[in-house]
């Protein structure tokens, strides 16, 4: 009743995530021993395969089991619970506070001795001046705005790092919790990106034996495009889960294994479509389509969320189709082009000249399979975090006829496509550069020279260094053909491990968006 009265039950379901609430009572035992229980809880939240059977129902304390991903965790505290958060959680070891995407307190004092251990978006109502100061300091706020009774202090270089401050004279904590979520927290998420030793496997009951969370010490703060009642908040895209057990059943995987489950076929996908496409008000052939392929073990909707593709699509107004392909990656080259054709036939506003493809890890493999089988239907490709293991001879014959702009997206701790020890793409990553240079009429190099050309190892035509979200250095190289068109690219983000990151959506689309393939001739057209 208490949770329902605050409105948190509805928020939990709306968020498709986790809300941790510290209660206002003083006699619940807040202190160091309670903090240890918080560590155990956080370990469970970030643990895979953590569930118990209760009355025949599977109950999942783990974020990944509940919503298919990580990082939608928000902390709320009132009264004594807020004081516990301020004095124990905020300054805890291992940056416990850095695992949550939003931190709300209603009341609650804070000791002068506490130092907030990492930046965290905070919403403080009836808080002390000490708490406001310390959270502003942790977030590096240097700018200010005021509206509707709420003061917002934010970091002008990284605006996601902010502190909202308000005073409530009506004693309505629930109203402010809902405000904090809807105005701030639901647009934020954490992603597990930097690999060191962080979350050690737990060996204590009741979590003994679960697959441990990845060894992570830093959770990046990133923007998010939440889905509420089947629509994205940014861009008002309709997100629809599709199941069709017949349409593609004639193409079945064979051989067994993770990517080729015997007899499996494409029957499940998500469609993410702008409203003007759904209601037929968009002009014919005016909206691009992105085929987006998830990684191994990923939920296909959370993949769109945690790579930032949902947010990029909302901002840019393109459509997305995301197939579930666990067990059928081996037949992606046959089945997924038919899924693209189905989308183009179903929605006349989608542009057949601007069909793009991307995918992460196993989804990168699906991307290679698609562009090897049917390069003619795609205007550009951006495989992520996956080496190239060769292409069939049939693909070589197709590439004699069709060019295909291709960018490999990876990171410096990506075990799949990057050689961390030597600081450049691994053999499979280099094969992407060599193969798609050759296919696009660019002479491959005889030997890579990483002394002369650090990281990329070969001549290039343009280079860009940027910083994403104020903390992640990003390197991008483009290689042009004899017409001056950039046809091959390499994009590398520093320090990220092999995991989903919300910056990838923008990186991929910023490359893909420049290309279209003429329907009549198959020619690639590039626009700045």
PLM features: residue spans?
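Short, proline-enriched alpha-helix->beta-strand connector loops that line the catalytic pocket
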Residues: 116-122, 158-161, 400-406, 484-488
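Short beta-strand/loop motif that positions the catalytic acidic residue
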Residues: 124-126, 408-410
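Active-site machinery of serine-nucleophile hydrolases
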Residues: 1-47, 148-163, 289, 293-346, ...
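Conserved acidic catalytic loop of the alpha/beta-hydrolase fold
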Residues: 38-71, 335-353
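Acidic catalytic loop of the alpha/beta-hydrolase fold
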Residues: 128-130, 413-418, 497-500
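Acidic, glycine-rich loop-and-strand cores that form catalytic or ligand-binding grooves
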Residues: 130-143, 424-469
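A domain-start/cap signature at the N-terminus of enzymes
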Residues: 3-6, 15-18, 26, 32-43, ...
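Flexible "cap/lid" loop of the alpha/beta hydrolase fold
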Residues: 109-121, 387-404
